[in-house]
Amino acid sequence: MKRFDYEFPVRIHFGQGCFEDSLKKELQKYGKRVMLAYGGGSLKRTGLYDRIVAMLNEAGKTVTDFGGIMPNPTLKKVQEGQLLARETKADLILAVGGGSVSDCCKIVSAQARLDSDIWDYEYAERKIPTDFIPLGVIVTASGTGSEQNNGAVITNEEKKLKSPLWGCFADFAILDPDLTKTVPMKQVISGAFDTLSHCMETYFGHPHTCNLSDRINEAVQRSVIKNLKALIANPDDDFARSELMWASAMGENGILKLGKVTDFQCHMIEHQLGAYTDCNHGQGLAVLHPILYRHIYKSAEEKFRRWAQEVWLVQDADEGIDFLADLIREVGLPTTFTEMCISLDDDIIRAIAESTVITPGCCKQLTADEIVEILNECK
């Protein structure tokens, strides 16, 4: 895919090799104080950290590190980041990594400009922040599409809730497929399934009559499936990396959701699973999706049949679900909680089910008892 720039509303720089030129241009637009945010040690091990710091120094920036952002970022980590941003009077937060780093920084950007706790501000006062520290994102692990929107998933450890919060849209995001070579293939596979999940969750939202958004969605799903297999077969396949990275962006930039009502119920169940187990997000979705779909597909059998025909090239709805399960096994994702090394007793399963928030949007509104049944089948 050719390099391009795009704004909707995040300013996107996309393409193989675009990283350095794009970052140099963007750094000219912001003040001297940059808070550099990242996750674990891979950024430094691969040398990308040193490259970015050198570019920041060359641009005359003062750099403050905010590292150690975990895969399921916590409210405590958000508060740590916002204190650092305030103390250093950051002019720009530069988030480097995958969805967890981006999610954390979107909320740090908002919390640093709020006097009250952002969790209470959004959930108790029912308000949405409007003032932010500018944010730039350099994507190294695609899949979540987090750089495309202002939503974030944050774990409140005290309340045992992993829930959406609303922060800033990034001012800019750099999507260079070459940078995904800095993360392990296991993470690439998990991220690609998260992309597929975003597309499926949107696709099965109301209305169930096929529209242009759904037709585009079908094409994105087919692309994810094809290019994930291609990349596993050949990790040097730059075209497949590019396609997966742009599919990730398409899954969450809002285009597929136009004209749709969605509840993302599989995500909401997995979020609470993550709140109690700190499990890998993409792997949790892989275990849940086929079992959940077998529970709900008869409530929208015609839509599931179309999905089977257009995405999986088979005739019947249940065949499509079987093919989804086959893909999960083929790419090496887990199919049970046991394979994820997760053990859930009845009390935890009930707690996950009771704390999962599902709003109307999908073809079947799940009850807590149905979620318990699904979780038990996932063991």
Regions found by a protein language model. Give the residues of each.
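Glycine/serine-rich anion-binding loops at beta->alpha junctions
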Residues: 90-106, 140-146, 276-279
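ATP/NTP phosphate-donor binding region
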Residues: 1-92, 337
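Active-site segments that bind and position negatively charged phosphate/pyrophosphate groups
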Residues: 202, 206-323
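A glycine/threonine-rich phosphate-anchoring loop and its flanking beta-alpha core
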Residues: 10, 113-212
